[in-house]
Amino acid sequence: MYFQHQFSSLNLNSFLPEGILIFNIIFILILDLVSQKENKSMLVKISFIGLLLSMLTLIQQWYHESTIAFLGSFEVNHFTTCFRLIISLCCILCIPLSFEYIKCSGIRLTEFIIFLLFTTLGAMILSSANDLITIFISLECLGLGSYLLTGYVKKDIRSNEAGMKYLIIGGTSSSIFAYGLSWLYGLSGGSIYLKSIAYSFSHLNPSYSLASWFAYICIIVGIGFKLSLVPFHRWSPDVYEGSPTPVVAFLSIISKAGALALTIRISDIIFPILEQDSNSILQILAILSMIVGNLLAMVETSMKRILTYSSIAQAGYLLIGIVAGRNNGYASLLVYMIFYLFMNIGAFSCIILFGLRTGTDQIRDYTGLYTKDPWLASCLSLCLLSLAGIPPLTGFFGKILLFWSAWQSGFYFLVMTGIFTSIVSIYYYIRIVKFLVVAKEKDISYYVKKYSTYKSNSLMKQNPIELNIYLCTFISGFVGIFMNPVIYFAQQSILK
């Protein structure tokens, strides 16, 4: 009876989406062991089915009340479920990109898919982790999978270098983060659960306020590296440039989603007593990230590096939602995160498709693409302009919601900085569009002149990347006009 009671108290149903992913990983491993030849299409179908089942379970959980699983180590509520949905959706959208990239590169898909699912699993657990040990282990799962994906193409020296850099920087940031967690553990008198630590902090002797500040700064520095916030961003352009492009698309979303969920939970549960001062730190990081990310993107010539610096600036915009605070602030962050997922993956899908057909990602090599492939050029332009926040595209409405929530909370300088940097970002996005639509024959690049494409009239025979582009471009371009259901979903995730 005692064992039965303990087992029922684990609430394993709450962990079912992650359990499906674990089963999926094990099944793919067993399938690879018993198969004589790698069946790439079968692997993609299996991973798709697992992720879709996981998403369906998450949608079902969203309609249920909050629960605590694994004796307090794992909390499931509407807010964490929303982030887990974003993470699993990101993985679903990145699998077609990976399949085509791996097929053209001639390397094994099995391990790549396993690392992709493993990283997704780490990010999902991180979003719902409720104690210090689970937080650190899930963060390391996310990090370890990221390092392996970054350096996956062993024959490419740039990929090897990127993987090694990421491993060293990631290990350093994890050490700083773990040091901050150890201070939380000590200051709380040996508690590992977030709410127990928060209770201890509410009764903390004022003489220990400096120590709690030190713990907070260590944690924010560790998370800052994961989010590529300025001044912790120096590693990301080099690492992302050397990584396989589908990995860059995947990590630019999934690391942000997991790290932002963790930041909100730690700031909201443990450090509400530091709310005003901690907001000052987050404001500074947001302002620096928006300014530096957009300014450095203006001088880049590689599409991957431009989108890397753009992702640094986007992390700054997303921080505005945390600074703005509960309800409206967090809801606007969730809405923009959903929109950013589709805008970013849509842009990367276009870059991957062009790269697979030409072998380049330099901006000037896109010159005149509209004359050869108007569909791809139009989709890429739409996704980039949406990232810039040009009305009436989806990105514009997402940014307006973020800025309005911060303005209502009184962060006027932060909002003005966000508006100014958004205007600056239009320059480098428009510059890319300008290259795409060049019509003069003499200006068309060598790669575009040699560019060839095949488009099937049948939807079922379309390239998987093209299907991705259809979906992401539609959402990036038009969903913002009808965004009320998305806002309702985000607000309900916060209010409940």
Curated annotation (Swiss-Prot):
EC number: 7.1.1.-
Keyword flag Cell inner membrane: no
Main location class: plastid
Reactions catalysed, as given in the entry: a plastoquinone + NADH + (n+1) H(+)(in) = a plastoquinol + NAD(+) + n H(+)(out); a plastoquinone + NADPH + (n+1) H(+)(in) = a plastoquinol + NADP(+) + n H(+)(out)
Recorded GO CC terms: chloroplast thylakoid membrane
Cellular localisation: Plastid, Chloroplast thylakoid membrane
Transmembrane segments: 14-34, 42-62, 79-99, 109-129, 133-153, 167-187, 210-230, 244-264, 281-301, 305-325, 334-354, 377-397, 400-420, 469-489
This protein's UniProt keywords: Chloroplast, Membrane, NAD, NADP, Plastid, Plastoquinone, Quinone, Thylakoid, Translocase, Transmembrane, Transmembrane helix, Transport
Entry annotated with the keyword Transport: yes
Membrane topology qualifier: Multi-pass membrane protein
GO molecular function annotation: NADH dehydrogenase (ubiquinone) activity; quinone binding
Pfam families cross-referenced by the UniProt entry: Ndh2_N, Proton_antipo_M
An annotated GO BP: ATP synthesis coupled electron transport
Top-rank taxon: Eukaryota
PANTHER family documented for this protein: NADH DEHYDROGENASE (PTHR22773)
Subunit structure: NDH is composed of at least 16 different subunits, 5 of which are encoded in the nucleus.
Protein family (similarity comment): Belongs to the complex I subunit 2 family.
Protein name in the entry: NAD(P)H-quinone oxidoreductase subunit 2, chloroplastic
Gene behind the chain: ndhB
